[in-house]
Each structure stands twice: as structure tokens, then as C-alpha cells.
Regions:
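Small-residue-rich helix-interface/hinge motifs
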Residues: 2-79, 293, 300-322
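Internal alpha-helical transmembrane segments
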Residues: 28, 52, 59-131, 333
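Functional transmembrane alpha-helices
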Residues: 83-84, 88, 196-297, 314-333, ...
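Hydrophobic membrane-targeting alpha-helices
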Residues: 110-118, 298, 302, 346-353
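PDZ-domain C-terminal substructure recognizer with occasional recognition of PDZ-binding tails
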Residues: 114, 144, 150-151, 164-207
Length: 360
């Protein structure tokens, strides 16, 4: 319960931090921002402070800052002359546009760095049992998570690779498995089943815990940077999988009640992130998920698709290179398609997270 609440608060904070990046950057270069909202759709609550309205809207799928002159179709009041987005220099526009994603990338980097230095990096599998599969040979014999496998069939197993080798040698059938349980050596008679992936090997039905490797403060910089990069690449790969025609066809099926969507193409809404947060069994896993949320937010917004931040940045580059203002008549259809696509994926994600929650 606490994990879910913490995840919900964190999502609001990360989206707000993203928009605050835009907002503060706009203020720094003299642009006028009239709205700062979390969410989209009908307004829940707002308050006017100075020239900016702050508030919340019903659909928790992001947020926005409205900067005068940023919309190509907006009519600008003469009173705002000199404070509009379109009047500013290229570097000022770029600073404002990239401040949001920069904030999220920095948050992700900071979280990854903190987790890495405090708890280390994932190492290789250990001989400690992390999970026991239901209806497996290990479960029937009485093995538990936390048991350390010392030997299988008379062969000592100081490493997980030794456990796998011993199971390969033992094959299906009765065998003795010795474990260390809280300092006490116990021997279990286990009736190993046949492995479905390794011919001739015995199958115990346990997964190992993953060890941790210590990381120093200096090493943590490179470690966190690699995780941010890997997360961004994985996000792009996931997006490309989601927009394939076969994937989109499956998403349409969700509206007809078919919620059996494969994990590799399943979109996740903030509701799903909160659900994952409630299932987090360690602080390391919980904070890693929060870091990835920031990477995903930043990477999606960097896509060169109008009206995302990356799309606005692409337009700013075009105008800088050509010396001409972008044609609003061409930008608006692109914006309509992009908004429609993300709204569609967002609704699919919400339906899936409500009707077929993610179970870790």
C-alpha cells in the first residue's frame, strides 16, 4: 500500500518537475507562461498567481506549461510583445524546450547513482534461492526462498553454475539436495522433474537471487550514465514495437475485451506504475522503477514529433536553418495524429492496468 502511494506521489512529482523545468527556463529568458497544469482534460482545481494559472486536470497522462506564442496558430496580444516564444533567439527556445527532458534525465541519473553507490550493481546469480516455483520438485520437497544450495547429488555447488551443472549430471529422478538454512545444514530428498529447456537435465524449480557488486562514488557516475542510456534505448525499442500494425491491431482488441496483450508490447499507464510500486519487495527495485519512469518521460518527449518537446525542437532547428517560420497548416495535422496516437495508447494502457493488472 505504501509503495503504491509513494509511486503515485513520485509520478506527480516527476511530471511536475518536467514542467517546472520548462517553466523556470521560460521565466529565465523572459517568456510569459500563462498556465502550469498537471493532467489533461476537464479542470479539477486551479489557482491564479500573478500571470500564471496553476492547477490539476482529470486525465493523469502528463502535464503542460502554456507559453505565449508557442502555438503556431495563437494570436499574440501586443501587450506581450518581447515576451513570446516565437520572438526569442534559437538558443533561448532550445533552452526552454530541452529543460523538461533535461530535468527528468538528471533525476533518473541521480536516482541510479544513489542506488548504485548505496546498494551496488546487480552481479551474477548466487546459490541462494530467490523464488520457489509452485508445484515444482523444490516446493514439494520443502525448499524455501533464502535457502543456500550447498550440494546437489553429492556435488558441491559454491556457484550457481555448479548448481546447473549438477542438475544436468543428475537428470530427472530422486536426488539429494543439501542447503544451508539460517546456518543449519539440511538435506532434502527431491524428485527432480525433466527440464524442458536442457535435454537430460533435472529440473529443481528454483530461481537464484542476484548478487550485488559494490560501486564507489566515482564508478557510480559511469554506472548511472550507462543505465540512463540503456533505459532510453530500451524505451525507443518499446515504442517502435508498439506502433507496428500488428501491435495496434491488438490494442483495438482491448476495447472489445481481449486484454491478453504480450508484455513486450504492453503500454503502461501511471495506474500500472502505482500497481508495480505496491509489489516492490525492496527499496532498490522501487527506486529503479522510479528512475526508469523519468527516463521514459524524457525519451518520449524527445521524439521529433510535434507537439512533443522534440517536435518543437525540430521545428526550431528548421526555422533556424531556413530562416523561415514553419507552416502551421502542415504542423497541425501532424499534431492531431500524434495526440490521437498517444491518447489511444494511454486509454489502452489504463484499460489494461484496470482489467488485467501487472503481476510481478
Amino acid at each position: 500500500m505504501f509503495g503504491g502511494l509513494a509511486a503515485a506521489v513520485a509520478i506527480v512529482f516527476f511530471v511536475t518537475a518536467h514542467e517546472a523545468g520548462h517553466f523556470l527556463a521560460a521565466k529565465a529568458v523572459g517568456m510569459k507562461a500563462t498556465q502550469f497544469f498537471f493532467g489533461f482534460g476537464p479542470k479539477i482545481w486551479s489557482v491564479q498567481k500573478g500571470e500564471t494559472e496553476y492547477g490539476f486536470k482529470w486525465l493523469p497522462l502528463g502535464g503542460y506549461v502554456r507559453i505565449v506564442g508557442m502555438s503556431p496558430m495563437e494570436e499574440v496580444s501586443p501587450a506581450d510583445a518581447g515576451r513570446t516564444y516565437r520572438e526569442k533567439k534559437f538558443w533561448e527556445k532550445s533552452f526552454v524546450l530541452l529543460a523538461g527532458v533535461g530535468t527528468n534525465f538528471l533525476l533518473a541519473f541521480g536516482i541510479f547513482y544513489g542506488v548504485g553507490v548505496a546498494d551496488g550493481a546487480p552481479g551474477g546469480p548466487t546459490t541462494e534461492v530467490g523464488m520457489v516455483s509452485e508445484a515444482s520438485a523444490a516446493a514439494a520437497a520443502g525448499l524455501r526462498p533464502g535457502d543456500v544450495i550447498v550440494a546437489v547429488g553429492g556435488s558441491e555447488t559454491p556457484k550457481w553454475a555448479d548448481v546447473e551443472a549438477a542438475l544436468q549430471t543428475a537428470g530427472p529422478g530422486p536426488n539429494a539436495v543439501r542447503v544451508d538454512r539460517d546456518g543449519e545444514l539440511l538435506t532434502f530428498d527431491v524428485n527432480l522433474t525433466a527440464s524442458e529447456t536442457h535435454a537430460g537435465a533435472g529440473f529443481l524449480g528454483v530461481t537464484p537471487t542476484i548478487g550485488r557488486v559494490d560501486i564507489g562514488p566515482v564508478e557510480g557516475v559511469g554506472y548511472a550514465g550507462r543505465l540512463v542510456w540503456d533505459g532510453a534505448v530500451s524505451t525507443l525499442e518499446a515504442i517502435f514495437r508498439m506502433v507496428r500494425p500488428s501491435s495496434l491491431a491488438q490494442y483495438f482488441g482491448v476495447f472489445l475485451g481481449d486484454t491478453d496483450v504480450p508484455g513486450e508490447i504492453r503500454p503502461v499507464s501511471p495506474i500500472g506504475v502505482v500497481s508495480i510500486g505496491t509489489q516492490a519487495e525492496s527499496a532498490t527495485f522501487f527506486f529503479t522503477i522510479l528512475a526508469l519512469v523519468n527516463v521514459i518521460l524524457a525519451t518520449i518527449n524527445l521524439l521529433p514529433l510535434f507537439p512533443l518537446d522534440g517536435g518543437h525542437f525540430a521545428v526550431a532547428i528548421y526555422e533556424k536553418v531556413t530562416g523561415r517560420q514553419a507552416d502551421a497548416r502542415r504542423l497541425l495535422p501532424i499534431a492531431a495524429v500524434v495526440i490521437g496516437l498517444f491518447a489511444f495508447l494511454g486509454f489502452v494502457a489504463i484499460i489494461l492496468d484496470l482489467t488485467n493488472p501487472i503481476n510481478l
